[in-house]
């Protein structure tokens, strides 16, 4: 097979030429090609305060941290697999693709179609492509990655057909693949088609990403010597944490780890009346990854945030509930009541526009569990609407 058919290309090469013409006309280069250009600061640093009296505490012998070396682009090798199953393959006419899947903190999508154009010598081919962050309008990111496409074989005597390429994906090069991946007549047979279904996979190995930050990930089930100094035991399962970090968020943990409680001298503490996976979710919310609050976890995070007096968790839950349309108003009012969430209660009351809205709340089973203060607030809202 000629080199023409084995070299990866953009799905729409005209897009790249148009982009280059615009950049050439403006006499600028893509910022992601030279990430080391550091702009001047817009604002001055805070005024220098008077120097404190120098105290010799041995710090003079400490070597400064080499930020320049640390800030060199670091490799963040991440792998992922995308799988595209194409039904009714013999009648494939238009482009089909997978949902987006995040690999290396960037969205990737595998796509396939047929092509019979000048670049395929007017021969019908099965084409496959990979999209990386195609919906972003930013020109500040780039991603070095290796992509391997595989056409799954249905015949045990025939290995999968594969092709691989390496590319720097960026705004100007976010779609790449093989327009001549395999001749149509070579694909459309029993070696690769079963029950009118063809399966294509793409293995993506991300080697380096610029302009997009990786979200920190933590495995609380693994002991990390430098940052873990406390073991929490829940239902005989161990979670390894940093007690000072937890104490910053929770006065309950501060008292447990640093006051005159018997746990102070321990390196392992058992927590009772806690569900392991729910507490693990709590840790993911308060650790630097700051996992978002969702409809699935908000209820038990409110319980745990209240139990351990973690104001950050309570605030995040309240912020989520104020903006959520998936949680019923009566449920929001009940939680606002239970955990004294004034902003949430205020939001619920402001969303009541008609007397019928209050009547609907009153007809619910949960209404009887509301406090007298909340019932009075609902009555006052009715009076405001009527008057």
UniProtKB/Swiss-Prot annotation:
The gene is bath-38. The lineage of its organism: Eukaryota, Metazoa, Ecdysozoa, Nematoda, Chromadorea. This is BTB and MATH domain-containing protein 38. InterPro entries: BTB/POZ_dom, MATH/TRAF_dom, SKP1/BTB/POZ_sf, TRAF-like. Residues 228-295 form the BTB domain. It comes from Caenorhabditis elegans. Residues 79-204 form the MATH domain. Disulfide bonds: none annotated.
């Amino acid at each position: 097979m000629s080199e023409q058919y084995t070299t990866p290309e953009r799905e729409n090469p005209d897009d790249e030429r148009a982009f280059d013409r615009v950049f050439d006309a403006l006499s600028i280069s893509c910022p992601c090609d030279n990430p080391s250009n550091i702009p001047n600061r817009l604002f001055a640093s805070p005024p220098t305060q008077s120097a404190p009296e120098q105290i010799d505490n041995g710090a003079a012998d400490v070597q400064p941290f080499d930020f320049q070396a640390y800030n060199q682009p670091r490799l963040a090798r991440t792998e992922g697999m995308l799988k595209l199953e194409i039904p009714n393959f013999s009648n494939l006419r238009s482009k089909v693709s997978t949902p987006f899947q995040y690999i290396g903190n960037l969205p990737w999508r595998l796509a396939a179609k047929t092509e019979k154009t000048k670049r395929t010598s007017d021969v019908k081919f099965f084409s496959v492509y990979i999209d990386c962050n195609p919906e972003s309008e930013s020109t500040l990111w780039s991603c070095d990655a290796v992509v391997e496409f595989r056409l799954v074989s249905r015949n045990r005597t025939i290995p999968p057909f594969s092709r691989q390429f390496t590319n720097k994906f960026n705004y100007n090069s976010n779609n790449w693949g093989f327009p001549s991946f395999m001749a149509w007549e070579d694909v459309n047979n029993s070696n690769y088609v079963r029950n009118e279904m063809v399966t294509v996979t793409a293995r993506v190995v991300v080697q380096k990403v610029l302009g997009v930050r990786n979200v920190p990930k933590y495995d609380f089930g693994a002991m990390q010597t430098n940052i873990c100094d406390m073991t929490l035991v829940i239902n005989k399962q161990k979670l390894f944490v940093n007690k000072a970090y937890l104490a910053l968020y929770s006065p309950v943990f501060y008292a447990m780890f640093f006051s005159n409680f018997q746990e102070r001298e321990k390196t392992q503490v058992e927590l009772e009346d806690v569900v392991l996976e729910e507490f693990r979710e709590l840790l993911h919310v308060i650790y630097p990854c700051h996992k978002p609050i969702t409809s699935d976890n908000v209820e038990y995070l409110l319980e745990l945030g209240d139990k351990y007096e973690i104001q950050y968790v309570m605030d995040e839950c309240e912020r989520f509930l104020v903006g959520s349309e998936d949680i019923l108003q009566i449920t929001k009012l009940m939680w606002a009541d239970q955990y004294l969430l004034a902003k949430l209660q205020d939001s619920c009351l402001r969303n009541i526009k008609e007397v019928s809205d209050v009547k609907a709340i009153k007809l619910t089973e949960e209404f009887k569990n509301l406090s007298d203060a909340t019932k009075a607030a609902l009555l006052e809202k009715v009076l405001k609407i009527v008057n």
